[in-house]
């Protein structure tokens, strides 16, 4: 008897067997409605089989309306993801079909594309870049200084693919970036792109998915999960700010959206374009070995000068109490404001202060569920853990020694810088942009609109503000703590610091007026600053590659982390040690177990085992065999992170 194996979008499910009614003609990839437990679900026809007896099997009910189906390329992507990231097929299918689209009737989202586009003239350098991209048959990086017009280049590519009737995906690391790109897109192409992110409602998702499956949606701008959308006719994949760590998913299925999007584009035979002013080490290495192609833009659009970068030695600054802005920076801000120019102050730390402690007994306020300090939030009068979200009141006395008036706060957060700026410049309009102050795309769009219309004089921001924004009247950037993050033990600490400082500095001087960037540092001789000041990313990349090579770390090797967690620390450590003891002999290096940098998270103690192997070694096959040798108790949660980006 002929049956269909149906892949349902549900965690930990493999394809299930269903009888095929004689009246129903099915093909691989068809979307069908099947009974599952007490309800009906939409599933994907995965494969067919013949069995001798099928009396206990349930029957496929029907195809979904409009005979919608998943392409063979998307099916290949599901298989690849499951194999590479060692995840269940059902979990991957849920990324492709995050909601049930079988309900009817439902309006289909359709974009009306008019091929008479209004595209601005390109510079000679940009025209050469477009020519190279048109001739390229491999993933291509557009590497250009901040403000060089990388977006306009891929807009010209989009125009070509729209004329061909193809679908286009533009990926951004955070959808907060989308506001300015959406406005520019509408101005250029005359219709609104579809936005795909976590804020899209269930009803909107159904409409969008139907539109994509029926090829009526042509352009999508989205965050990580947009790469799984079931495009029928994908022609171009753009991965903007390709270096950004936000492309790595750190919960659920631990995948890298940039890398997966490149695989997706390869399966679909789509052109793949990566963009960044500060590309990742991995991408630069792939260019070096000929796997990717490079297009370089050395000039800003309209030949606008790059900003000057000045380093302020904070060891020589005499700051007044509760002050974090140097006299040099304060004077520069005054001059800038007097000239009717805008200022950006950058500190990658949310809240008012990162730590509260008792001066009498030394007690530090830490999260009861995590191994992290509680951050002081003066605006909400709360202490908050930025890892699990736990909150408590701000105490008036020490809960440890019970002394009064002994509590003090240490270090600045973004709210503290706002307080200082308002005291120094009371007549000026000051705004803050961070995850606490701009919790939805609408609020972010409002702040950006105010900035563009010169309704804000000083914008104070976290990492959110470093990515791709264009403010022509902004000529001064002040980095409050340029040392933050550069001195930790993370493999990628130097890379992240260089990228962050280069990107935030690139917000200055993009219109009229020379830009200047001030980096406040207690370690002014840090070699990273010399690379940033000189704008010499090539030397930085070369130096970083040498360090990675000598340490046998990516991109010269492949790595995986096994993360074990649970509420009983000693038992979790015991299981981790047992795993290492029975590890199969192979040409791999095993480090650990060691406590994670975040040793306790949401009440669970965490230990890591790091596996380092040769680039050609089948790490997934090795891990599967290793895990088959040990039974993990139910109280221990095990995760595998292929190609880990961090070790928190």
From Swiss-Prot:
Residue ranges occupied by any Helicase C-terminal domain in the UniProt entry: 393-548
Entry binding sites for ATP: 144-151
Gene3D superfamilies: P-loop containing nucleotide triphosphate hydrolases (3.40.50.300), PriA, 3(prime) DNA-binding domain (3.40.1440.60)
Motif placement: DEAH box: 240-243
Co-factor: note: Binds 2 zinc ions per subunit.
Cofactor requirements of the protein: Zn(2+)
Catalyses which reaction(s): Couples ATP hydrolysis with the unwinding of duplex DNA by translocating in the 3'-5' direction; ATP + H2O = ADP + phosphate + H(+)
Pfam families for this protein: DEAD (PF00270), Helicase_C (PF00271), PriA_3primeBD (PF17764), PriA_C (PF18074), Zn_ribbon_PriA (PF18319)
Swiss-Prot/TrEMBL keywords: ATP-binding, DNA replication, DNA-binding, Helicase, Hydrolase, Isomerase, Metal-binding, Nucleotide-binding, Primosome, Zinc
Recorded GO CC terms: primosome complex
SMART domains: DEXDc, HELICc
Binding site for Zn(2+) 1: 358, 361, 398, 401
SUPFAM superfamilies documented for this protein: P-loop containing nucleoside triphosphate hydrolases (SSF52540)
Binding site for Zn(2+) 2: 367, 370, 385, 388
Any one biological process term the GO annotation gives: double-strand break repair
Record-level Gene Ontology MF annotations: 3'-5' DNA helicase activity; ATP binding; ATP hydrolysis activity; DNA binding; zinc ion binding
Domain Helicase ATP-binding: 131-297
Record EC number: 5.6.2.4
Superkingdom of this protein's organism: Bacteria
PROSITE patterns per record: HELICASE_ATP_BIND_1, HELICASE_CTER
Family: Belongs to the helicase family. PriA subfamily.
Subunit-structure text: Component of the replication restart primosome.
The protein's role, per its UniProt record: Initiates the restart of stalled replication forks, which reloads the replicative helicase on sites other than the origin of replication. Recognizes and binds to abandoned replication forks and remodels them to uncover a helicase loading site. Promotes assembly of the primosome at these replication forks.
Name this protein carries in UniProt: Replication restart protein PriA
Species of provenance: Rickettsia felis (strain ATCC VR-1525 / URRWXCal2)
Gene, per the UniProt record: priA
